[in-house]
């Protein structure tokens, strides 16, 4: 058993122990609404808490059939955060979030964030999931994860939940314990594993193409916005330079006018002084006679 399988087994044992401990000490809490009634609306804080808890357990969800136990663990963690939600409510809310996220895949990131406020949180979970698969592919076998399990990792989460629950029911059916049927299923599983590997590779390639396309569109949008911003900034700078030139011209004109006015006043003052001096000289001559 390698380190990855050991970690996964340890995590399942912890979750099972936590589930049994909770059942032994905590009485069954009824759903906040009766069957058939509408679930109470989820708040933004409550939804973010659910996404965070579900993201922490995402790898375990992808590698185990006992999702019912995991949803009960999520429900208990939500109650610990003062959000009394039943496992079924958490599961339904997660399916709705996945559906909305998949509906935003063809949009630009900025538009998706405006229409779906939890886009970044969901994107982080799915990107991390794909990175794990890429790492498993590069290791040449997925660390003990079967081809069918890897294929389910990239199917929709709605299908994943139903498939895992059906697998649990089938494994408990006595009719399936027929050895001949088990041998036939194993032979069929070999071909399914090969097909699953091809399917996983196609999904990975499509995902990478989608990522490259999204990054290219984002880069083009960013460059267009940057170009528009630079053009507006250049236009604003040009207008400011024109206004500065106009201000300097007006100031120069005002100074010229002010100098002309002072020159005229000085000339008038000189003429006035000359006239007064001439008049005084005349009066002096007349008085002496």
From Swiss-Prot:
The keyword Transcription applies. Residues 42-98 form the Myb-like domain. Gene3D superfamilies: Homeodomain-like. One of its GO terms (molecular function) is DNA-binding transcription factor activity. Residues 156-168 have a biased composition (Acidic residues). It holds the Pfam family Myb_DNA-bind_4. This is Trihelix transcription factor GT-3b. It comes from Arabidopsis thaliana.
């Amino acid at each position: 058993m390698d380190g990855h399988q050991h970690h996964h087994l340890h995590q399942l044992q912890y979750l099972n122990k936590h589930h049994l401990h909770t059942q032994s000490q905590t009485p069954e809490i009824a759903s906040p609404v009766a069957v058939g009634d509408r679930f109470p609306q989820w708040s933004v804080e409550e939804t973010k808490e659910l996404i965070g808890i579900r993201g922490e357990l995402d790898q375990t969800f992808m590698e185990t059939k006992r999702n019912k136990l995991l949803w009960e663990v999520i429900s208990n963690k939500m109650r610990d955060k003062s959000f009394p939600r039943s496992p079924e409510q958490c599961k339904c809310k997660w399916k709705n979030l996945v559906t909305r996220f998949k509906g935003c895949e063809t949009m630009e990131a900025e538009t998706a964030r405006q229409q779906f406020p939890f886009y970044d949180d969901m994107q982080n979970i799915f990107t991390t999931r794909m990175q794990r698969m890429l790492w498993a592919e590069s290791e040449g076998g997925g660390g003990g994860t079967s081809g069918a399990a890897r294929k389910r990792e990239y199917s929709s989460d709605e299908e994943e939940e139903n498939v895992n629950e059906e697998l649990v029911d089938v494994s408990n059916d006595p009719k399936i314990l027929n050895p001949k049927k088990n041998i036939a299923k194993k032979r069929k599983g070999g071909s399914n594993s090969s097909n699953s590997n091809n399917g996983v590779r196609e999904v990975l390639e499509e995902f990478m193409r989608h990522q490259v396309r999204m990054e290219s569109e984002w880069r083009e949008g960013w460059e267009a916005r940057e170009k528009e911003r630079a053009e507006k900034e250049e236009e604003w700078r040009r207008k400011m330079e024109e206004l500065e030139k106009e201000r300097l011209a007006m100031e120069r004109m005002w100074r010229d006018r002010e100098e002309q006015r002072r020159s005229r006043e000085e000339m008038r003052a000189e003429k006035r002084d000359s006239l007064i001096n001439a008049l005084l000289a005349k009066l002096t001559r007349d008085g002496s006679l």
